[in-house]
Amino acid sequence: MIQYLVILLDDTSVSFCHYGNGHKERRLMPADTLKAGILYGMKENLNIQFVYPDYDLPEEYDKIIESVDHSKIKPASRQKGADVVVIDGIEEAGRTDVRSGTAYVLRTDKTGLFGGHDIIVKLLQHADRLNITLTDVETFTDDDFDKYKDMLKQLAADVEKMYAEGHSPQLNILTDRMMLDKMNNCGAGDTTITLAPDGNFYVCPAFYQQPGGYAIGNLKDGLDIKNSQLYRLDHGPLCRICDAYQCRRCIWLN
């Protein structure tokens, strides 16, 4: 059952997951499409999440967006008013002003992760929640997994110290694994769909922002999800018996 509608406000809207955005030229979603998307979300009683590009929107768009309850996902360079702030890489993380009351997503490759311990700890000292998303997880070797294990041990000690001092940050790759008692996947194609600037629905932003993606309907004709059961956890023979509950079970990577 669909519960969330992700609306990409521009072709260059920030990526908040494993995929990179292959679109480099700005193309703002037409105002009429935005209004129609919001109306669709309201009619279907969906939670709406707006994903912003790295530039200020026209005032008209701000008024349209504020006409409905929603969450804002923004790049770190435009984090004012954001519910979720996306930090693209360890280098950007080092210069990002982190504040409480906001969730942060750190997109990084394995090199950045293994070499960015001090920066990650600094983020955790100020953020209430940090999600670390690896952009090259498919390239991991046995040696990388050993490094990852050591990294988690270091972070576990750091987070334990923060908890003892009265600050209780959430870290998806660490505390989620301890707190969750069931799968907490992204739900692309099952509980979440994406509306792109072209007026079409997609399984998730990656299916629009990367080559090889495909639409699953449009605002005019509605959703048309082929073999929709395949997006569900109960049709994933390996995932449904896995206990790595913090895994996002990325539909795009799979």
Which ranges hold each PLM region?
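The −1 position to Zn-ligating cysteines in a subset of zinc-ribbon hairpins
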Residues: S13-C17, N185, L238-I241, Q246
